[in-house]
C-alpha cells in the first residue's frame, strides 16, 4: 500500500483490512480517480497471488463501493465505523486489538507512513480526543448497524 500511495493524489484517511474485505477512506487531491488508485494497488497483488497459486482471474468478489462524504458528522462516523469493523464481525473483543487498521494512528494522535494526519489535526486537536469520540460511538453500538 505504501508504494502505491502518492501523497499528491490520494490521502488515506482511515483503513481497516479484514479477512474477507477491506475499508479505505480516501481523500482525492487531484484528477487521478480513487478507482485508478485502487486498481494500481490491487493489480500487482492479484498477479502475484495468481502466479503463486497457478490461477487466473479476479480475487475480489465485488468492486469498491464508493461513498461521497458530504459533511463532518458523516466523515467522523464513517471513520468510527471503519475502526469498529473488526469488533462488529467478532474478530476482536476490543478494536484496539486489531493491528490491520489505522485506529492506533488516531488513538496516538499521529499520522503513520500510510495515513494522513488531516482529520486527526483538523477535528481532534482541541482537547476532545478521538479516543473520547470513538468510545462514545462504541457505547452507542452504532457499529452493529450497516453503514449507509
Residue ranges and their predicted role:
Residues 1-148:
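Short catalytic/metal-binding and nucleic-acid-binding patches
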Amino acid at each position: 500500500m505504501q508504494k502505491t500511495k502518492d501523497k499528491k493524489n490520494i490521502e488515506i484517511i482511515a483503513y481497516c483490512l479484514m479477512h474477507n474485505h477491506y475499508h479505505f477512506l480516501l481523500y482525492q487531491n487531484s484528477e487521478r480517480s480513487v478507482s485508478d488508485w485502487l486498481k494500481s494497488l490491487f493489480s500487482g497483488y492479484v498477479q502475484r497471488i495468481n502466479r503463486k497459486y497457478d490461477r487466473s482471474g479476479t480475487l475480489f468478489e465485488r468492486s469498491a463501493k464508493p461513498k461521497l462524504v458530504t459533511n463532518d458528522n458523516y466523515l467522523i462516523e464513517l471513520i468510527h465505523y471503519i475502526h469498529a469493523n473488526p469488533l462488529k464481525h467478532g474478530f476482536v473483543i476490543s478494536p484496539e486489538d486489531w493491528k490491520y487498521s489505522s485506529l492506533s494512528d488516531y488513538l496516538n494522535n499521529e499520522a503513520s507512513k500510510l495515513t494522513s494526519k488531516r482529520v486527526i489535526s483538523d477535528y481532534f486537536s482541541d482537547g476532545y480526543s478521538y479516543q473520547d469520540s470513538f468510545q462514545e460511538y462504541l457505547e452507542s453500538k452504532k457499529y452493529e448497524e450497516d453503514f449507509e
